[in-house]
C-alpha cells in the first residue's frame, strides 16, 4: 500500500494591506507549501526571508515561487527568494510563476521582479486565469480575481491529498465559487469584517457567500487588514462557521496546517 506524503501549509504571515504591512501588526510573509521534497512559497511580502529562516524553512529549498499580483505585501521579498532558490545564482533552477504586472508591468503597475532575477531561474511562467502549471509535486491552476491590479489571480492547488483553494486578493463576484468547488481547504484572503463593504477585497459578507456556494470541507481566513484586526478575526471566523456549518478558522502568524 502506497503512503501519500502529507501536504503541509505554513501560514507564516496573516497580514494584508498597506497599514498592516507598514506597521507589521501581523506579518506579511505569505504561505509555504510542502509535500515530500517539494517546497513552494506563495506571495512573499515584507519579512518573508527573515521569518522563513526563523521558522527553519530555508528559501534555498524552494522549488517554486508564486506571486499572484503586483502589490508590495505580496512581492517584496521575491528577488531575494530567487537568489536563495538558485543557490546564490549558481544554479539555474526553480519555477517563478507570476502575473504580467509582476513580470513585465502593465497599466502603470510594475514590474516588480527584475529581468536579471527572471533570467536566473529555471522556468518563468506568466500566469493568468486558466493557466495550469507545475512546481515539483504540485499542480496549480490560476483562477479569476477582481482586484485593483487587473492582472491578479487566485490559485487552485492540486495536491496528493486533495485540492486547496487560495483566493488571493479579490472582491466577491458572481461566479467566483466556480473556481473553488471540490476543495479540502479554502484559504480566504479576508481583509475586512462584516458590514464594511469593499469591492476590491473580500470582507466577511463576501466570504459567507463564497463559502456557502463553494462548500469546501474547511476554510481558513487570512490576510487581515486593520479593520479586520480591530473587529477580531476569530469572531468573524466563528460567525462564518455558525452561518455555514463548515469549520472556519482565523489564521495566526506561524500557523501550520497538515492535510493527509
Residue ranges, per PLM feature:
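Cap/insert and terminal regions of metallo-dependent hydrolase folds
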Residues: 172-256
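Active-site metal-binding motif and surrounding structural segment of the metallo-beta-lactamase
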Residues: 46-97, 184-185
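Active-site neighborhood of phospho(di)ester-bond hydrolases with catalytic His/Asp-centered motifs
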Residues: 41-45, 63-73, 99, 165-170, ...
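Short helix-capping segments at alpha-helix termini
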Residues: 87-91, 113-119, 241-246
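Short histidine/acidic/glycine/proline-rich micro-motifs that form metal-
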Residues: 18, 72, 100-104, 192-194, ...
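Conserved beta-strand hairpin/beta-sheet module of binuclear metal-dependent hydrolase folds
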Residues: 2-55, 152-168, 185
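Short glycine-/small-residue-rich Rossmann-like dinucleotide-binding loops
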Residues: 13, 45-46, 144, 190-192
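Metallo-beta-lactamase
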Residues: 2-4, 93-152, 159-161
Amino acid at each position: 500500500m502506497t503512503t501519500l506524503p502529507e501536504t503541509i501549509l505554513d501560514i507564516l504571515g496573516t497580514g494584508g494591506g498597506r497599514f498592516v504591512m507598514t506597521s507589521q501588526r501581523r506579518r506579511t510573509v505569505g504561505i509555504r507549501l510542502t509535500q515530500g521534497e517539494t517546497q513552494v512559497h506563495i506571495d512573499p511580502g515584507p519579512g518573508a526571508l527573515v521569518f522563513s529562516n526563523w521558522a527553519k524553512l530555508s528559501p534555498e529549498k524552494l522549488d517554486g515561487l508564486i506571486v499572484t499580483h503586483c502589490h508590495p505585501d505580496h512581492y517584496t521579498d521575491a528577488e531575494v527568494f530567487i537568489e536563495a532558490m538558485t543557490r546564490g545564482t549558481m544554479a539555474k533552477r526553480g519555477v517563478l510563476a507570476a502575473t504580467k504586472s509582476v513580470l513585465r508591468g502593465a497599466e502603470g503597475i510594475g514590474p516588480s521582479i527584475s529581468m536579471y532575477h527572471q533570467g536566473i531561474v529555471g522556468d518563468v511562467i506568466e500566469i493568468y486565469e486558466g493557466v495550469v502549471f507545475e512546481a515539483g509535486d504540485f499542480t496549480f491552476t490560476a483562477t479569476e480575481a477582481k482586484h485593483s491590479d487587473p492582472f491578479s489571480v487566485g490559485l487552485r492547488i492540486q495536491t496528493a491529498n486533495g485540492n486547496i483553494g487560495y483566493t488571493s486578493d479579490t472582491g466577491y463576484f458572481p461566479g467566483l465559487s466556480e473556481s473553488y468547488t471540490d476543495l479540502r481547504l479554502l484559504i480566504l484572503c479576508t481583509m475586512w469584517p462584516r458590514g464594511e463593504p469593499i469591492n476590491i477585497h473580500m470582507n466577511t459578507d463576501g466570504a459567507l457567500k463564497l463559502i456557502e456556494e463553494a462548500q469546501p470541507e474547511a476554510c481558513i481566513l487570512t490576510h487581515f487588514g486593520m479593520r479586520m484586526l480591530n473587529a477580531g478575526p476569530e469572531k468573524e471566523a466563528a460567525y462564518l462557521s455558525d452561518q455555514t456549518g463548515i469549520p472556519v478558522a482565523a489564521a495566526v502568524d506561524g500557523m501550520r496546517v497538515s492535510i493527509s
